């Protein structure tokens, strides 16, 4: 629950009520992604089909009777989480977000399932048991695309779980928090639709090879902690997409699959917004708690045993507003060395001056 947002802090539900989250965000140390407000204000994105030249609108989707029967964002999110078929989950996600935007429904309150519903395939195994490309039965481009589809499907559930799980605290967090993560869920559902379409064009489908459940296990770690959820999911898991995206694009180009590389490049471009949303809300909640974001982020990673691995795409992370000193120990070590070097230089200068003064005194 929100009252355990940071176990080492003095945050309580009552103190949070006295100081509701402010939407102002001014800090020279944490510059926002320049496109955040444009992303928030943009109209519904119906470009869920990948055409000859890129994303384009798909044929109109008939409204789902289930989505039409509920009256709040949280209830619709719980419905998406309880849907096992991946393509249906993707479609319902878009319908739910569209209805909430068009009808201006309330956030409401609901409870998420213990785990999101999943199809019989793919088989979920330990990450070490994921077959190598040559043993997967898929060509390299389909192998990489299947892995990305799995990430995007999990990302749909991760975003909706954040909406639903913390819906009892909508008065504390504010509607914008839920609007942001519902939009993230809609983006992820579009990304999965593109991956699924491209897999079908290659003659494969999601579920044709095993996948891991690592992403959801990371989500479960933060099920009672909104600050940890923000740290672990957008600032670690989503940020890994910024690192991996350009490398994946280059591998696909090298394989000769330009169309799939274009899909992946567009997904990587849109993931910047998701990391930026995480940074915005993580810093906002930390400010509300009177905690410095950088040490708080590091403390949470240690507490929840979350490892941040490189290589890092520093430029994309910086664009999203994620400061390098939060996650890169090498930067901190380098800064320490530079500080020590400056101290050493100052001491050497002082010693040199003392020697000169001593020599002058002797000459006198």
PLM ranges: what are they?
Residues 2-364:
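Non-heme di-metal
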């Amino acid at each position: 629950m929100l009252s355990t947002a940071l176990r080492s802090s003095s945050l309580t539900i009552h103190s949070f009520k006295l100081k509701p989250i402010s939407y102002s965000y001014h800090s020279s140390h944490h510059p926002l992604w320049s496109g955040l407000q444009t992303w928030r204000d943009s109209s519904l994105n119906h470009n869920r089909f990948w055409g000859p030249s890129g994303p384009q609108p798909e044929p109109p989707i008939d409204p789902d009777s289930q989505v039409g029967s509920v009256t709040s964002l949280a209830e619709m999110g719980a419905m998406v989480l309880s849907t096992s078929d991946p393509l249906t989950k993707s479609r319902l996600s878009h319908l739910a977000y569209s209805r909430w935007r068009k009808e201006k429904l309330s956030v409401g309150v609901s409870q998420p399932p213990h785990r999101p519903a999943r199809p019989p395939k793919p088989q979920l195994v330990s990450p070490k048991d994921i077959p190598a490309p040559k043993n997967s039965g898929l060509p390299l481009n389909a192998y990489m695309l299947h892995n990305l589809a799995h990430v995007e499907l999990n990302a749909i559930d991760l975003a909706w779980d954040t909406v639903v799980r913390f819906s009892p605290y909508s008065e504390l967090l504010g509607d914008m928090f839920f609007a942001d993560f519902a939009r993230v869920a809609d983006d992820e559902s579009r990304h999965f639709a593109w991956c699924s379409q491209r897999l079908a064009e290659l003659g494969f489908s999601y579920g044709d090879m095993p996948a891991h459940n690592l992403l959801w296990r990371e989500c479960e770690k933060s099920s009672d902690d909104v600050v940890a959820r923000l740290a672990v999911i957008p600032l670690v898991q989503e940020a890994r997409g910024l690192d991996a995206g350009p490398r994946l694009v280059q591998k696909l180009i090298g394989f000769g699959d330009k169309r799939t590389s274009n899909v992946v490049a567009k997904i990587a471009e849109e993931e910047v917004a998701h990391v930026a949303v995480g940074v915005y809300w993580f810093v906002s909640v930390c400010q509300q708690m009177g905690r410095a974001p950088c040490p708080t982020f590091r403390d949470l990673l240690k507490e929840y045993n979350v490892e941040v691995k490189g290589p890092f795409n520093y430029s994309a992370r910086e664009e999203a507003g994620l400061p390098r000193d939060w996650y890169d120990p090498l930067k901190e070590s380098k800064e320490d060395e530079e500080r020590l070097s400056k101290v050493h230089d100052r001491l050497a200068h002082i010693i040199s001056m003392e020697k000169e003064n001593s020599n002058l005194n002797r000459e006198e």
